From Swiss-Prot:
Molecular function (Gene Ontology), one example: protein folding chaperone
ANK repeats: 36-66, 70-100, 106-135, 140-169, 173-203
Pfam families, alphabetized: Ank, Ank_2
PANTHER family from the UniProt entry: ANKYRIN REPEAT DOMAIN-CONTAINING PROTEIN 29-LIKE, ANKYRIN REPEAT DOMAIN-CONTAINING PROTEIN 39-RELATED
Organism of this sequence: Schizosaccharomyces pombe (strain 972 / ATCC 24843)
Keyword presence, NADP: no
Cross-referenced InterPro entries: Ankyrin_rpt, Ankyrin_rpt-contain_sf
Cellular component per GO, a single term: cytosol
Family annotation (Gene3D superfamilies): Ankyrin repeat-containing domain (1.25.40.20)
Keywords assigned: ANK repeat, Repeat
Protein name: Ankyrin repeat-containing protein C6C3.08
Record-level GO BP terms: proteasome regulatory particle assembly
Amino acid sequence: MVYASLGKAIEENCPEEYVEQAIQNDPNSLNAVDDDKRTPLHWACSVGKVNTIYFLLKQPNIKPDEKDEAGWTPLMISINNRSVPDNVIEELINRSDVDPTITTRGGQTCLHYAAGKGRLSIVQLLCDKAPELIRKKDLQGQTPLHRAAAVGKIQVVKYLISQRAPLNTSDSYGFTPLHFALAEGHPDVGVELVRAGADTLRKDSENHTALEVCPDRIVCNEFLEACKEQNLEI
């Protein structure tokens, strides 16, 4: 089968032998970019072809940190793809030619994505490698803790709290991590945030507290009851 490019071939799940032969025939294809500015490594990470990822990373001239049109690196794509296991992502992070502090066009970092996906071991490694990312805001003013709280990733929330992530930082809409936790229906996360010192009276840009943006009475009651049981002041 004939493919338009090596990246397209990987996207369409070509045999692994094809990748090796293509690079032997044309070494420049290793880092060639398509119309989306994606390299073959971007596509291998996108479709979760682990053996191909390893093969590409072993090539001496590989450029593993290129940005695509949206500013995404192969590392970012891997973190967002559940079919790419943690050990592959860890290898990318530990490479000297990969910068985990790169941001997308939206200002997100790898830690934003790892936190939002609940990939605790990756969150821990990124925090060790680049602790400044813990406080990094994207263009919407959101930190990794905002991301983790919004999707209910409580183990990541606990870890970020232990690393002194800012609890009461507001995004561009005035939402704190606590606002997100309750608005998205995660009372257990809300309790963890309050236990750590989150301000329950902080208001968003429309003058609403976290409890006031909680749309579900059951969630609100679970949160209030748990706080009461643990003698947490609201």
